[in-house]
């Protein structure tokens, strides 16, 4: 059972970012000019102390507007993601970076965190690993410097959260580009930062945008990419256990996990164990989607092929049973001329020919 190739969308340049970055450079006001240029003071009758007090007050007012805009943009991002308006959400993340740069400056950890959020957005909302790596890399050194120097536990927690997201983004972006070693290297760093973060929380529950299960799955896939099959299987077994503990043994989240675990077992030539994983996935499909559904048909076909791959004579009946179930379910739900119906029928015919039989007409 081969893993499906991943299509990586690319663009020649990052137009949204380049335009907004240019605007932010024009918008950012040097600190020494903020009161003089925006708020000229000219009260000839005012004392020096009164003038300084007014200048300070105006400087605070000058920065309150971008801060309000930043808070609004952050709320808007969450709402747009909830509404699955991914492109608009990504553009709003760009606004957050620009506003953070204006408020905090290029070298502040909060600006770097905004860049890490943007990188994660390019990865998860847009599926653009090149842009994701670009922005994550530009944020990394700033976050690491602040992490090393901060004395505030609260600040360190937020920096560690940003680093988990940053290294996860880099890892998955490399994985999408079929660079397993680089992916695994960065995901290990994400894992170390998550461990440090959990120690700071002192065992308390921390809700992170990149969950521990997200990271476990990514590490499993990266391990598979570098052919460390035993390690990959250990990560997937952990992910399966965590999902069952959190959501029960009939959640749709388990289907793809069982499929990937079965793929690893097939690569390890443990065909019986692969069949067991696919049987569990099939059972979940039947309970969630019924026996006659495209998803259950797909899982029946995978089970048929897994039984066939074992090469054991005792599994011949199971191969036929699951191929026929799959074809019948596809015909009932998608029609006789659908691609899935035809391709599954073709695979069944090939298996019958290879085994010296003819398909009944």
From Swiss-Prot:
InterPro entries: TPR-like_helical_dom_sf, TTC23/TTC23L
UniProt-listed SUPFAM superfamilies: TPR-like
Biological process (GO), any one: response to endoplasmic reticulum stress
Signal sequence residues: none
Keyword terms: Coiled coil, Cytoplasm, Cytoskeleton
Location(s) in or outside the cell: Cytoplasm, Cytoskeleton, Microtubule organizing center, Centrosome; Cytoplasm, Cytoskeleton, Spindle; Midbody
Record's GO cellular component terms: centrosome; cytoplasm; midbody; spindle
Coiled-coil features, chain-numbered ranges: 67-95, 176-209, 256-283
Annotated protein name in UniProt: Tetratricopeptide repeat protein 23-like
Organism: Homo sapiens (Human)
């Amino acid at each position: 059972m081969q893993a499906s190739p991943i299509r990586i969308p690319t663009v020649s340049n990052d137009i949204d970012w380049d335009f907004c970055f240019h605007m932010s450079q024009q918008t950012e006001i040097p600190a020494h000019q903020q009161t003089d240029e925006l708020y000229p003071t000219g009260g000839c009758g005012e004392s020096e102390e009164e003038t300084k007090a007014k200048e300070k007050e105006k400087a605070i007012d000058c920065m309150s507007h971008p801060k309000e805009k930043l808070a609004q943009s952050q709320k808007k991002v969450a709402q747009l993601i909830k509404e699955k308006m991914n492109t608009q959400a990504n553009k709003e993340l760009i606004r957050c970076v620009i506003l953070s740069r204006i408020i905090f400056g290029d070298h502040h950890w909060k600006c770097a965190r905004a860049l890490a959020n943007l990188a994660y957005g390019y990865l998860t909302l847009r599926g653009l690993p090149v842009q994701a790596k670009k922005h994550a890399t530009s944020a990394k050194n700033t976050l690491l410097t602040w992490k090393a120097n901060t004395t505030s536990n609260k600040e360190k927690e937020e920096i560690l959260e940003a680093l988990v997201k940053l290294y996860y983004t880099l890892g998955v972006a490399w994985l999408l580009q079929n660079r397993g070693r680089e992916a695994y290297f960065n995901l290990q760093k994400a894992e170390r930062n998550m461990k440090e973060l959990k120690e700071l929380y002192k065992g308390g529950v921390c809700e992170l945008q990149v969950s521990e299960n997200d990271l476990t799955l990514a590490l499993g896939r990266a391990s598979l990419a570098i052919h460390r099959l035993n390690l990959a299987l250990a990560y997937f077994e952990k992910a399966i256990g965590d999902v069952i503990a959190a959501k029960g043994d009939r959640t749709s989240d388990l289907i793809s996990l069982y499929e990937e675990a079965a793929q690893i077992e097939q690569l390890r030539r443990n065909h019986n164990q692969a069949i067991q994983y696919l049987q569990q996935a099939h059972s979940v499909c039947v309970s969630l989607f019924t026996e006659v559904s495209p998803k259950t048909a797909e899982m029946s076909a995978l089970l048929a092929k897994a039984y066939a791959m074992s090469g054991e004579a005792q599994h011949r009946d199971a191969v036929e049973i699951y191929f026929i179930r799959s074809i019948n379910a596809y015909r009932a739900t998608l029609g006789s001329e659908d691609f899935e119906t035809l391709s599954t029928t073709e695979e069944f015919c090939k298996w019958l020919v290879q085994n010296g039989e003819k398909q009944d007409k």
